[in-house]
């Protein structure tokens, strides 16, 4: 049964680093993990990697909203994402970030090669600009009506209804997502990837037969409508990698995001001290296999742009794309108000990971069909299949083996032909796992479980146990049941890793695909302990209620200094150097007639006197208390004429205003007139 070992690199689409993992994400990661675990069981060398997609304006703006830096936000998100995936036993060899040195180097390398090969074009474009926020609007921050299918409320780069891609300027009735303002047009020089140059190569790849039929058909539609050059640059302000030799221009997030697959693998190789595998897997003539598990909403990027970028920069193309559909809950789109928009972490507070892994697996196929998580059906199916059919098979037999035979199984099989029926099914079940026909694999396994339970029903060990002189029969029957259980759990091991660990502990034997040909005979098992508990609708109700409460909590406004007053746009060192900050001694402080906000300060700069009006009266109702205190002032601010006189600078203070204003003071020892650097 052993196959020739293959070298396989598997990826999942990179989760965006501005939000939590939810059950929609988990479909893909579970699907990929089941496939990867099966490949590993068959002896293949599998590298399973992922990363956070950590760039783009949405992350920059979300960080501002939270009052933290983008780097801090993506760091916290990465930890949260990795915790969630570990909780669902997603067996990644490496989880990285697109905001990494490896990804920067590879993005610059691929861009440079594309440019050297003539595939990067420059031209000035008219771009949507938010006049209220003073920024160019990235694709995802413009919404309007799709120019192709006329669906409303679609983003500026692609339509989630028909899958079309387009320029934000093509949207009908566009609006800024940031401010709600109607964008205006402004010119900007942008860089374009010449996708049409790869049309012939992409069509040949499509016709190769490797892609899912639905994907190939969709690509053919795109070819017929004509491929367009792809805008790969964005203007500052932008959180990402600056394009080499192009100040103020950044790589569009969708350029460096798929390169993140390469970056994560490079990071893994470096961790291992492996200097050869990266080139071995990614060189143009590599014989390693590369598979991307993705959702149907990002097929365009992975089936057109990504292979074309790789081809144009002399790297290998993917072996295949494995595309899945969306997740609905109880027959409808996931809803925050109904409590069906469920985060991965919330699920794990109410159910184990194996339960969702099993339910998704039972519904998955190689097609791009949506999967419905019907919560009532979920409870019934987990109890009927995992508990009643599989685990119950072990519990019905293990007690007799433990109590009557000291845990030792019979030396011979009671029904070798029946056992062969189970092991012969390995070919069909293995092919179903291989071809991602997961639902078929589960149906085959559950059909065998029915046969195994029927065998136990017919042999009735509970009756035999009461009959004198039939100990050997009892041991043989129960040993047969446990061996059939072992085969079933071997087939289910890619799906149920936690349960499999418990089963291996009970059997005192690893669940190994190639070992099922040899049954456990004369083998001592350990004391049987409950392997899996039934679930009920009360847990579902608690899950839904928890999700609703989390939505309410998340809707509470974020407060704090950075949230209330976000950090301003970045300035250069030269800009900062223009500001001349000096230590100043407050010689006098007094109220200003006609103003309930200002104090008049007389400042000594160590040989020069300044008159400054400062709006700090609400925090310092007794101005005399300021006399003799040192502070910091902007000494080279242009004088400002006011109706009370001329203000010759500005003193520095912190706080939101009102009584919460705090005049800055240097440490003891500072002298009036000294420069603050």
UniProtKB/Swiss-Prot annotation:
Give one Pfam hit by family name: Anticodon_3
Cofactor(s) listed in the protein's UniProt record: Zn(2+)
Co-factor binding comment: Binds 1 zinc ion per subunit.
Keywords carried by this UniProt record: Aminoacyl-tRNA synthetase, ATP-binding, Cytoplasm, Ligase, Metal-binding, Nucleotide-binding, Protein biosynthesis, RNA-binding, tRNA-binding, Zinc
Q: Which residues form the tRNA-binding domain?
A: 575-677
Location of the motif 'HIGH' region: 15-25
Where Zn(2+) is bound, by residue? Answer: 146, 149, 159, 162
Q: Which Gene3D superfamilies match?
A: HUPs (3.40.50.620), Isoleucyl-tRNA Synthetase, Domain 1 (1.10.730.10), Methionyl-tRNA synthetase, Zn-domain (2.20.28.20), Nucleic acid-binding proteins (2.40.50.140)
**What is the role of the protein in this entry?**
Is required not only for elongation of protein synthesis but also for the initiation of all mRNA translation through initiator tRNA(fMet) aminoacylation.
Q: Which family does it belong to?
A: Belongs to the class-I aminoacyl-tRNA synthetase family. MetG type 1 subfamily.
The name on file for this protein is Methionine--tRNA ligase
The beginning of the lineage is: Bacteria, Pseudomonadati, Pseudomonadota, Gammaproteobacteria, Enterobacterales
